[in-house]
Structures are given as structure tokens and as C-alpha cells.
């Protein structure tokens, strides 16, 4: 074959291969970064737990994930009372992964019992759960080589996260803390605190506290009103001065009562009530962790330099 014809063939072949290879690479990259389905429903994670007990949600717990320059901190999800790694975060794990975050979720505070009881987290004392979170964060930092993580927590998970931050060395490991329905000052204080004070005046304070703590949920008593745990954790202020907090709360919270205990002012703290500017949002304690409106506020708290529109439409209670 003449050399000039061979050169023409090589050029033609190269011209054909470049777009073909580019197409293959594009398809491969698209598959690697394919969007995970996001079902805005607080209970959307439960089917994953039923199908794969103790597993991970789509987009979560990829230990080979490396944070990008746009999102340098991995996000750790900290569930609420009775929740778990999958059951609490059916919305947030795939949503964050789609946004390009490395996202991780654990089940803390569960009893060492067979499934499905092993999937019910947030039962043990908060101090024990915080130690589990501390170990998990260390694992995330080691795997991703990140300097810090961001936390998104729901309900009791906020106290677990804050105890880690303030008492277990987490201040140097957490950058942003997004707190959904956080019982910072204890819950049901107006109801429980007068009864607790009366019992203490009668010398029955320990018996009163023991009665509150008699349920399988040891953490539940720690979150009530001015319980010893709450008073001790907040003795030096609610927040850690090195961490940026965003509180997201609903006026219809039936478990964090009054809802204003989730909105404590602070120097590096932003307080958001989801009904402000959107009267159609009827989410309550569970639904707020399933709604797209609250999720948009959370995304903007993680990345305030690239804010996304926050939707406003009818959001039902319970599911969000």
C-alpha cells in the first residue's frame, strides 16, 4: 500500500475513533455519576432497609469517594430517635450524592439484638452514641483524606452530634452543622420541668428521673426539659464557637416542644423556620426530614456560595 494512502487511512481511522472513544468515555462517566432517584418522603428509606438489612442507601457509604474541590467536606448523616442509617435518610443520601458530595450514614445507639431491632437506633445513652459517631467520623476522614466533615442531623442526632463536637474533640473535625428539628434546650420542658422540680422539692428527684429513664430508650429521658444531660451539655453555651450551625425547624413540631428550643441564637448560627414565607408547608417532626423545602435549605447551608432555589408548595405532615 502506498505510504500516502496509509497515512490517509490512519488519519481517517483516527478521526473516526476520537468521537467514538469520547462517546464511550462520556457514557462511562455518565453511568458513574448517574442520578440516584430521590423520593421526597420521610419513609422512603425503609424499603431499602427491608431489602438489605443493615446496608447502605443509594449514594451513601462509598468508601472510595474522594471529595471534590467544590465540596471538600464529606457529609455525615446522624439520624434521630428510633431511626437508622437507611430508615431516616431516604431523601438525603441520594440527594447529596447527586449533588457531588461524599455522603456517609451510620446507625448509632442500637441494642445488640437481631434484626429488625438492630435497625432501631438512638436507644442507648447519648454519650455512648456520640462515641460511636466519633469513631465513624474518624473512619470517614481516614478514608477520604478530608480535613473535616459536615454534619446533617435530625432530632436526637443533633444532641449526639453536638456532644461529639463539644465533648469528644469533634470541634476540630466538623465545619458545618445542619440541625433539623434539634432539641437544643430539651423538649417538653414546660410540661416536665415543673413536675421534675416538684419531685425534687419532695426529695423524689432521683425516682422521678429513674421513672423517665425506665423505657428502652435511655436517650429519651436525657432530652426532656432541663434534664441533667441538657444542663451539662449547655453549661458552656449551646454551640461550639468553631462550628457553623444552621437550624431548620417547623412550627408544627410535635416532639420538639416548644419548637423555639430548636432556634437558639448564636454568633455563627442561622435559624430557619420552614413556614416563614411558605404557609403551605405543614411538615412536622418527621416530615421536615422528608420535604424538598427543608432539603433545599440544607443544601444551601452546606454550600452558601452556590444557593439553589427553595421551593414552596403544599408539604403534608408525617411524610414531608
Model regions and ranges:
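C-terminal catalytic-base region of ester-bond hydrolases, centering on the histidine
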Residues: 199-201, 238-320
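Flexible, membrane-associating and regulatory peripheral segments of lipid-active enzymes
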Residues: 2-98, 313-320
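Conserved alpha/beta-hydrolase
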Residues: 96-115
Amino acid at each position: 500500500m502506498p505510504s500516502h494512502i496509509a497515512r490517509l487511512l490512519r488519519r481517517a481511522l483516527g478521526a473516526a475513533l476520537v468521537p467514538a472513544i469520547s462517546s464511550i468515555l462520556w457514557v462511562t462517566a455518565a453511568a458513574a455519576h448517574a442520578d440516584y432517584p430521590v423520593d421526597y418522603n420521610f419513609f422512603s428509606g425503609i424499603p431499602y432497609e427491608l431489602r438489605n438489612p443493615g446496608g447502605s442507601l443509594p449514594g451513601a457509604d462509598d468508601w472510595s469517594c474522594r471529595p471534590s474541590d467544590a465540596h471538600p467536606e464529606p457529609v455525615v448523616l446522624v439520624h434521630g430517635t428510633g431511626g437508622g442509617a437507611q430508615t431516616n435518610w431516604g431523601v438525603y443520601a441520594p440527594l447529596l450524592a447527586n449533588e457531588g458530595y461524599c455522603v456517609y450514614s451510620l446507625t448509632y445507639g442500637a441494642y445488640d439484638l437481631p434484626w429488625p431491632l438492630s435497625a432501631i437506633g438512638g436507644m442507648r445513652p447519648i454519650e455512648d452514641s456520640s462515641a460511636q459517631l466519633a469513631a465513624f467520623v474518624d473512619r470517614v476522614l481516614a478514608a477520604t483524606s478530608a480535613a473535616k466533615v459536615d454534619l446533617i442531623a435530625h432530632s436526637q442526632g443533633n444532641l449526639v452530634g453536638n456532644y461529639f463536637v463539644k465533648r469528644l474533640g469533634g470541634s476540630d473535625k466538623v465545619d458545618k452543622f445542619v440541625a433539623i428539628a434539634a432539641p437544643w434546650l430539651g423538649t417538653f420542658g414546660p410540661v416536665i420541668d415543673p413536675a421534675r422540680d416538684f419531685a425534687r422539692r419532695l426529695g423524689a428527684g432521683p425516682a422521678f428521673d429513674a421513672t423517665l429513664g425506665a423505657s428502652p430508650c435511655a436517650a429519651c429521658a436525657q432530652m426532656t426539659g432541663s434534664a441533667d444531660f441538657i444542663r451539662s451539655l449547655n453549661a458552656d453555651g449551646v454551640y461550639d464557637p468553631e462550628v457553623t450551625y444552621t437550624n431548620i425547624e417547623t412550627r408544627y413540631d410535635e416532639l420538639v416542644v416548644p419548637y423555639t428550643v430548636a432556634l437558639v441564637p448564636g454568633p455563627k448560627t442561622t435559624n430557619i423556620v420552614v413556614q416563614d414565607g411558605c404557609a403551605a408547608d405543614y411538615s412536622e417532626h418527621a416530615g421536615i426530614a422528608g420535604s424538598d423545602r427543608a432539603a433545599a435549605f440544607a443544601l444551601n447551608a452546606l454550600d452558601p456560595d452556590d444557593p439553589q432555589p427553595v421551593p414552596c408548595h403544599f408539604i403534608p405532615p408525617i411524610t414531608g
